[in-house]
């Protein structure tokens, strides 16, 4: 199964801006690997909360539409809230 997430490049980096994004229902994330510069991104929480429940999300290539360009990535790490069903941050690596 293929998964697609719509994302935007983040311009503000840091704890404060990440908290503001989370309160707005968004998930901060980063894409890194393959000798490329890391890219900080943000996407809607509702876009990932349902697809991450599928086991093959963690093993298959996920397509991220980043500012109009498609990027193939794999989920590397995911940080979740301690007791709420909220994803706080995701690390992706280039596929």
UniProtKB/Swiss-Prot annotation:
Pfam name, any one: Ribosomal_L25p
One GO biological process term: translation
SUPFAM superfamilies: Ribosomal protein L25-like (SSF50715)
Protein origin, superkingdom: Bacteria
A GO term for molecular function: 5S rRNA binding
Record keywords, A-Z: Ribonucleoprotein, Ribosomal protein, RNA-binding, rRNA-binding
Cellular component annotations (GO), alphabetically ordered: cytosolic large ribosomal subunit
Entry-linked HAMAP family: Ribosomal_bL25
Subunit structure comment from the entry: Part of the 50S ribosomal subunit; part of the 5S rRNA/L5/L18/L25 subcomplex. Contacts the 5S rRNA. Binds to the 5S rRNA independently of L5 and L18.
Similarity field: Belongs to the bacterial ribosomal protein bL25 family.
Function: This is one of the proteins that binds to the 5S RNA in the ribosome where it forms part of the central protuberance.
Protein name, UniProt field: Large ribosomal subunit protein bL25
Organism: Shewanella sp. (strain W3-18-1)
The encoding gene: rplY
């Amino acid at each position: 199964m293929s998964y697609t997430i719509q994302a935007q490049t983040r311009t503000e980096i840091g704890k404060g801006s990440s908290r503001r994004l989370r309160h707005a229902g968004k998930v901060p994330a980063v894409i890194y690997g393959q000798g490329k510069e890391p890219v900080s991104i943000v996407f809607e929480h509702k876009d990932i909360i349902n697809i991450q429940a599928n086991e093959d999300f963690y093993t298959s290539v996920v397509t991220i539409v980043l500012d109009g360009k498609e990027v193939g990535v794999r989920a590397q790490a995911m940080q979740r809230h301690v007791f709420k069903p909220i994803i706080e941050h995701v690390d992706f690596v280039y596929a």
